[in-house]
Amino acid sequence: MMPRLILASTSAYRRELLGRLHLDFDTARPEVDEHALPGETPQALATRLAGEKARAVAVRFPEAWVIGSDQVADLDGQALGKPGTLEQARAQLTRMSGRMVRFQTAVSLIGPDGFAAQALDLTDVQVRPLQPQEIERYLAAEPALECAGSFKCEGLGITLFDAIRSNDPTALVGLPLIAVARLLRQAGFSLP
């Protein structure tokens, strides 16, 4: 019998990505405060939140394997959170215009037997120089208020970039499947 697997996320994008591995899984909302701690780096924030999300769900489902993931946009060492409002999204996109932004995407796997492992994927995005009217058109068409960096790379947001550099093309969407598959194999899951 396959062990129960739970994705600690309600993100449709993460659910779609994990579905690519052809594993049966459920989803559960992790109740976690996503604010950065004083002095916390973007990498430490992403790693901590991925672990906290997995642990928050594992407490509710102690018999299950739980995957938690978090992504933080890193501009010059400063974490850019989910914008939440159009004003914040506009400000983030303006700050990122013509700049390289590093996306720190962490994943954590926790098992019922005490297994715990994490991985981190780094994706560098070169944002092209953006005119104010381009930002306005983008936000009118696709307000990505719940996305790190204020864009959806799997949608119209891809038009905002000059280049993406990553070892895992799924990481920028929010769940680095190469790392997830590696962690699941380490835990004994059968994947090709």
From Swiss-Prot:
A Gene Ontology cellular component where this protein is annotated is:
cytoplasm
The record's catalysed reaction(s) read: N(7)-methyl-GTP + H2O = N(7)-methyl-GMP + diphosphate + H(+)
Q: Which cofactor does it need?
A: a divalent metal cation
Give the annotated active site: D70
Query: One MF term from GO for this chain?
Result: nucleoside triphosphate diphosphatase activity
Enzyme Commission number(s) = 3.6.1.-
Question: In this UniProt entry, which residues are annotated as the site Important for substrate specificity?
Answer: Y13, Q71, E154
> Could you give a single Gene Ontology term from the biological process aspect?
nucleotide metabolic process
For the keyword Cell division, the answer is no
Where in or outside the cell is it found? Cytoplasm
CDD domains registered for this protein in UniProt: Maf
Q: What general EC class does the enzyme of this chain belong to?
A: hydrolase
Q: Which UniProt keywords apply?
A: Cytoplasm, Hydrolase, Nucleotide metabolism
Primary site of residence: cytoplasm
What's this chain's function?
Answer: Nucleoside triphosphate pyrophosphatase that hydrolyzes 7-methyl-GTP (m(7)GTP). May have a dual role in cell division arrest and in preventing the incorporation of modified nucleotides into cellular nucleic acids.
Q: Write out the similarity annotation.
A: Belongs to the Maf family. YceF subfamily.
Which HAMAP family does the UniProt record give?
A: Maf
**What is the name attached to this protein's record?**
7-methyl-GTP pyrophosphatase
